A protein has these predicted regions:
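N-proximal short alpha-helices
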Residues: 6, 17, 21-27, 40-44, ...
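Alpha-helical transmembrane segments and their immediate juxtamembrane interface regions
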Residues: 85-125
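Helical transmembrane-bundle signal
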Residues: 11-22, 66-76, 99-106, 110
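Juxtamembrane inter-helical linkers in multi-pass membrane proteins
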Residues: 32-47, 121-126
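Membrane interfacial helix-start motif at the N-side
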Residues: 42-63
Length: 126
């Protein structure tokens, strides 16, 4: 049972990190454009405007997807209660790997939104 609780916590880690960082980024981007923390792509780092836009947009998507992922991520874990460490670990692994898609997919949507709202040089399209 202890391993099952541990795996449930691991399975919820990605959704709750998405919610937390989504809230943080949607409310405010890191103060300075940097290559260490934040949503960092060549387009988002063009200027202050693209930096703030990208963080707000990406943060909203991550927060929403994090909440959407939380419950469906835990439900399959109930099917392996008391089944032993191998089935519990395998289920946790499958869930965690499936969470990588919604973790990474918002990058493509954010880049598309940046290209829609800004030109190649980072100037806002009116």
């Amino acid at each position: 049972m202890g391993f099952w609780i541990f795996m449930c916590a691991i399975v919820l880690l990605i959704p709750f990190l998405m919610i937390s960082f989504g809230n943080l980024f949607s409310k405010s981007a890191p103060k300075e454009i940097n290559s260490a923390f934040g949503y960092r792509t060549s387009m988002s780092m063009k200027n202050e405007d693209t930096w703030k836009f990208a963080h707000h947009y990406f943060g909203q998507i991550w927060r929403t997807l994090g909440w959407i992922l939380a419950v469906p991520s835990v439900i399959p874990m109930f099917f392996v209660i008391g089944k032993g460490n191998d089935p519990v670990g395998n289920m946790g692994l499958i869930i965690t790997f499936s969470q990588l898609i919604p973790l990474i997919l918002p990058i493509f949507f954010t880049e598309k939104a940046l290209r829609k709202h800004f030109d190649r040089n980072g100037n806002r399209i009116l």
